[in-house]
UniProtKB/Swiss-Prot annotation:
Coiled coil: 457-489
Superkingdom classification of source: Eukaryota
Subcellular location, record wording: Nucleus
Bias (Polar residues) ranges: 119-128, 362-375, 420-436
Name of this chain's protein: Transcription factor Sox-5
Gene: sox5
DNA-binding stretch(es), residue numbering of this chain: 559-627
Function as written in the Swiss-Prot or TrEMBL entry: Transcription factor involved in chondrocytes differentiation and cartilage formation. Specifically binds the 5'-AACAAT-3' DNA motif present in enhancers and super-enhancers and promotes expression of genes important for chondrogenesis. Required for overt chondrogenesis when condensed prechondrocytes differentiate into early stage chondrocytes: sox5 and sox6 cooperatively bind with sox9 on active enhancers and super-enhancers associated with cartilage-specific genes, and thereby potentiate sox9's ability to transactivate.
Length: 757
């Protein structure tokens, strides 16, 4: 008798576990129910029923074969009822089970211990032939069959073939799989075939190695190409950056050059617009000394001029200062105000009538030789020359004696000086009579004494004379302010009907006054020398009109203000209104445009605000240092009261209408010197409809002055400026002819009509 081998406890513990099937349980449950039904039918005959734990279902064909085998086995066991036959059958089953176990060990090495346990159980069951033992042995047989079927199914499952298996031959792959499954005995082949397979495998390995090297080389090339592209891009970016920096430097240099050019142009304009400082004729023995003194004091000597003592050329020496700085260097003790007053005094000396006798001037200084400038002035009566910078900068000779001065009266309307005024020549003196006041004659005496040769090298005397001239000027100014409120019947101003007359008056004002160099003295000044009453008694009244040059210095060019949204819109609208109504005044047009603009919606105004932003940006790029300097509103001083232009015009209109019927008949044929001086000229800054029809006397003309750049003692006017600026609105509705010189062109600015918010 065989004894049951001792098994480890681990194996016994593992034997109680049955493998779970990876497949569904539907077919297994059907098979189990069928087998149970058959067992119960057979158990009714007195046979023991075998309950097979078929929990795993297989595909149809393997399951049917297995079930048939199990059915045959149970049938045979039921037919043979003898104990001996049962024992033999159990031994046969044990042998079969052992064979199955051996095959299972060959196919699945990992289940050797379990197979040993099953064989031990089968041996113990053979020793004990009880129905329970037989039932357990049948269950083990069924489990073994199921395990075998599972192994076959696992082998038959399609596996994902790796990449290397695609490159191998089919027979070699089958042999590898057979070797991997443990069937070493099934591998068939000779050493030659094995060597061939090994050679093929080495060839394949070499091919894979070469392919790997090619891939690595291609990857390296791609890396190098990408690195080269990145380097090229970096170089291009650096080159573009350098080009941008170079362009920026060039633009900066261009801006600097443009700035220098603008400064030079401003200096040239200042030099061309300064009135010349004139020094009279010197005797031949003093020319060398005068040239040396002029060279030391910064004067410009005309090139090619001979300074030999024996030189007797007919043209006198004329010394011209190049700039205001040269004149200041010539007289270092003078302030800018004194230099300006010196120029004004010389201009006043030029305006003396030819018939007036100048006391204090030596008679030998009035030479009979005529300078080219005076000849040119006399020729201007018949053929006036064109205006240019050279003509403006050409000096006058005070020592030249005009022709026919004794035979003609200063009050004659056919005086050549009146023709000079109307012809637009550069030299337009304003005449005066011999009945001038002693104050005016004294100032002229001082100014004429400055022209004597003795004062050339005597700096103290020149300074003293200039100081006296300044005192005379201040005294005249105080007297004029005292006489502002009085009515003077000796003033006669012609009508101002055309724009041509206005332009000629502006040209006359610029030529007579010049343009000073300092900003605080930037306003122009015109002096009208009036004398004589209706009865011939001596009297004087001086009226001044101060005009402000848009709040900037003479050396600074005017920069137009960028148009705002209203001006952009009003440019075309104004043109349309003028086409429909050519005679409509600008003030009425501005009022109409202002009311229309206020009635527009924000959506309608939007494109004009966008255009304003574009123009502002363009203006800022073109003029980065631009600063808006508005022109203050003008005021009038009438009888010691400050009045606006509209109020002044209303007062003058009422006075003129009340006095037109009171003109004496005896004065109808009297021509006043003031009227002679302004014959053919428009009245400055007076509207045409407000001037008198004839040269009738008019009440005292007040001082019309700008409130910008006034002297320090006139603080009350500055307070009015601040009040006017506070009251500024977006649309300044001014009276008629309030600002007649405003340019209403499409490209010009209109600071008085519209104020920016």
């Amino acid at each position: 008798m065989l004894t049951e081998p001792e098994l480890p406890p681990d194996i016994n513990r593992m034997s109680s576990k049955r493998p779970a099937s990876p497949y569904g349980e539907a077919d297994g449950e059907v098979a189990m129910a069928t087998s149970r039904q058959k067992m119960e039918d057979e158990g009714s005959d007195g046979l023991p029923a075998f309950h097979l734990p078929l929990h795993v279902g297989f595909p149809s064909k393997p399951h049917s074969e297995e079930f048939q085998a199990v059915s045959l086995l149970t049938q045979e066991s039921c037919d043979r009822r003898s104990p001996s036959y049962q024992l033999n059958s159990m031994e046969l089953d044990c042998n079969k089970m052992s064979a199955f176990a051996l095959h299972n060990v060959a196919t699945s090495p990992m289940k050797a211990e379990e197979v040993g346990r099953q064989s031990g159980d089968s041996l113990s069951n053979s020793m004990l032939g009880t129905p329970e033992r037989r039932k357990g042995s049948l269950a083990d047989v069924v489990d073994t069959l199921k395990q075998r079927k599972m192994e076959e199914l696992i082998k038959s499952e399609p596996e994902e073939t790796p990449t290397i298996e695609k490159l191998l031959s089919k027979d070699w792959k089958d042999k590898l799989l057979a070797m991997g499954s443990g069937n070493l005995a099934d591998v068939k082949g000779t050493p030659e075939s094995l060597a061939e397979k090994e050679r093929q495998l080495m060839t394949m390995i070499n091919q894979l190695t070469s392919l790997r090297e090619q891939l690595l080389a291609a990857h390296d090339e791609q890396k190098k190409l990408a690195a080269s592209q990145i380097e090229k891009q970096r170089q291009q970016m650096e080159l573009a950056k350098q080009q941008q920096e170079q362009i920026a430097r060039q633009q900066q240099q261009l801006l600097q050059q443009q700035h220098k050019i603008n400064l030079l142009q401003q200096q040239i304009q200042v030099q061309g617009q300064l009135p010349p400082l004139m020094i009279p004729v010197f005797p031949p023995d003093q020319r060398t000394l005068a040239a040396a003194a002029a060279a030391q004091q910064g004067f410009l000597i005309p090139p090619g001029f001979s300074y030999k003592p024996g030189c007797s050329d007919p043209y006198p020496l004329q010394l011209i200062p190049t700039t205001m700085a040269a004149a200041a260097a010539a007289t270092p003790g003078l302030a800018p105000l004194q230099l300006q007053q010196l120029y004004a005094a010389q201009l006043a000396a030029m305006q003396v009538s030819p018939g007036a006798k100048l006391p204090g001037v030596p008679q030998n200084n009035l030479s009979n030789s005529i300078s080219p400038s005076s000849v040119h002035t006399d020729k201007s009566t018949s053929s006036p020359p064109p205006k240019s910078k050279d003509d403006v900068a050409q000096p006058l000779n005070l020592s030249a004696k005009p022709k026919g001065s004794d035979s003609r009266s200063s009050s004659s309307p056919t005086s050549p000086h009146i023709q000079r005024l109307s012809s637009g020549s550069t030299h337009k003196p304003i005449s005066s009579t011999s009945a001038s006041t002693p104050i005016r004659l004294n100032s002229i005496d001082i100014l004429s004494s400055l022209t004597s040769p003795g004062y050339l090298n005597d700096h103290d005397a020149v300074t003293k004379a200039i100081h006296e001239a300044r005192q005379m000027k201040e005294q005249l100014r105080r007297e004029q302010q005292a006489l502002d409120g009085k009515v003077v019947n000796s003033l006669g101003l012609n009508n101002c009907r055309t724009e041509k007359d206005k332009s000629s008056l502006d040209a006359l004002t610029q030529q007579l006054t010049g343009k000073p160099n300092e900003d605080k003295f930037s306003h122009a000044m015109m002096d009208f020398n009036l004398s004589g009453d209706s009865d011939g008694s001596a009297g004087i009244s001086e009226s001044r009109i101060y005009r402000e040059a848009r709040g900037r210095g003479s050396n600074e060019p005017h920069i137009k203000r960028p148009m705002n949204a209203f001006m952009v819109w009003a440019k075309d609208e104004r043109r349309k209104i003028l086409q429909a109504f050519p005679d409509m005044h600008n003030s009425n047009i501005s009022k109409i445009l202002g009311s229309r603009w206020k009635s527009m919606t924000n959506l309608e105004k939007q494109p004009y605000y966008e255009e304003q932003a574009r123009l502002s940006k363009q203006h800022l790029e073109k003029y980065p240092d631009y600063k808006y300097k508005p022109r203050p509103k003008r005021t009038c001083l009438v009888d010691g009261k400050k009045l606006r232009i509209g109020e002044y015009k209303a007062i003058m209109r009422s006075r003129r209408q009340g006095q037109q019927t009171q003109i004496p008949i005896s004065t109808a044929g009297v021509v006043y010197p003031g009227a002679i001086a302004m014959a053919g000229m428009p009245s400055p800054h007076l509207p045409s409809e407000h001037s008198s029809v004839s040269s009738s006397p008019e009440p005292g003309m007040p001082v019309i002055q700008s409130t910008y750049g006034i002297k320090q003692e006139e603080l009350h006017i500055k307070e009015e400026i601040r009040g006017d600026n506070i009251n500024g609105e977006m649309y300044d509705e001014y009276d008629e002819e309030d600002d007649p010189d405003i340019d209403y062109g499409s490209d010009s600015e209109n600071p008085s009509a519209t104020q920016a918010n």
